[in-house]
């Protein structure tokens, strides 16, 4: 059975998240329906990341098995036709080895969080960025963010319902960049805890407002106490931007799209 790797982008606003849920619209659900629509097969669409309700993606990766040997461009175009009118697009399809797994073969996941730092409401970026009206010091946020890099117990930034076996994660990147009113927070790690990125962003906002120092953020991390976390940032600003795989597998959703 041929195995295909799909690179997917989507607007998460109308969905109850990635994972199939009974009687709720999900990204995985509409992708599975699209596969069945053109192939007649009940294929499992296995994703690299289980994004929450309202979270977007520019570089989600999934894999599927199909009984028939289709050309990758045929799979892409057929899924495009069957995904309409949902705000989901399969932007690339590749044939991959049978042991490729979108989730377990991944060596790094890259997330982007978008903030628009202005008082006026958002007309074009509504539901696609977090509008923060109070002035933020992005430079202070970036300096503080570096205190979270490396291997730590991230219990402070972990959702109560997180099912991960351990709260320890290794954070490889957490950069805060400003251009005009736009603030972009880019973070990378092999994997993240449930709500970890949004929790870190919410805490960095306190630094940007001048309410916390870099030491305060480091102390919150060291406390390993969810009650020490800042307010969790909303889902609308978060994007799964890219997923990286070992060198023998082409990197998908290249970070230059972030």
UniProtKB/Swiss-Prot annotation:
It comes from the Bacteria. Keywords: Isomerase, tRNA processing. SUPFAM superfamilies: Pseudouridine synthase. The active site is at 52 (nucleophile). It is an enzyme of class 5 (isomerase). GO terms for biological process: tRNA pseudouridine synthesis. It holds the Pfam family PseudoU_synth_1. Its EC number is 5.4.99.12. It catalyses: uridine(38/39/40) in tRNA = pseudouridine(38/39/40) in tRNA. GO terms for molecular function: RNA binding; tRNA pseudouridine(38-40) synthase activity. Substrate binds at residue 111. HAMAP family: TruA. Belongs to the tRNA pseudouridine synthase TruA family. Formation of pseudouridine at positions 38, 39 and 40 in the anticodon stem and loop of transfer RNAs. Homodimer. This is tRNA pseudouridine synthase A. It comes from Azorhizobium caulinodans (strain ATCC 43989 / DSM 5975 / JCM 20966 / LMG 6465 / NBRC 14845 / NCIMB 13405 / ORS 571). The gene is truA.
């Amino acid at each position: 059975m041929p195995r295909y790797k799909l690179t997917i982008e989507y607007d998460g606003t109308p969905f109850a998240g990635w994972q199939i849920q009974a009687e709720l619209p999900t990204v995985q659900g509409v992708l599975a329906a699209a596969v069945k629509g053109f192939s007649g097969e009940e294929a499992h669409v296995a994703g690299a990341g289980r994004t929450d309700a309202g979270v977007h993606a520019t570089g989600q990766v999934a894999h599927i098995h199909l009984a028939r040997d289709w050309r990758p461009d045929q799979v892409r175009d057929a899924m495009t036709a069957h995904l309409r009118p949902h705000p989901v697009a399969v932007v690339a399809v590749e044939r991959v080895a049978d042991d490729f797994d979108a989730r377990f073969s991944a060596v790094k996941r890259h997330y982007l969080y978008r903030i628009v730092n202005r008082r006026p409401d958002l007309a074009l970026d509504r539901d696609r960025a977090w509008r923060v009206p109070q002035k933020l010091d992005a430079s202070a946020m970036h300096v503080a963010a570096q205190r979270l890099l490396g291997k730590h117990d991230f219990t402070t930034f972990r959702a109560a319902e997180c099912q991960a076996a351990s709260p320890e994660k290794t954070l490889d990147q957490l950069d805060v960049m400003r251009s005009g009113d736009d603030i972009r927070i880019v973070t990378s790690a092999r994997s993240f805890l449930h709500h970890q990125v949004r929790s870190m962003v919410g805490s960095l906002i306190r630094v940007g407002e001048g309410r916390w120092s870099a030491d305060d953020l480091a102390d919150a991390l060291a406390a390993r106490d969810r009650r020490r976390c800042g307010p969790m940032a909303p889902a609308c600003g978060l994007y799964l931007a890219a997923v990286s795989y070992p060198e023998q597998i082409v990197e998908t959703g290249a970070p230059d799209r972030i």
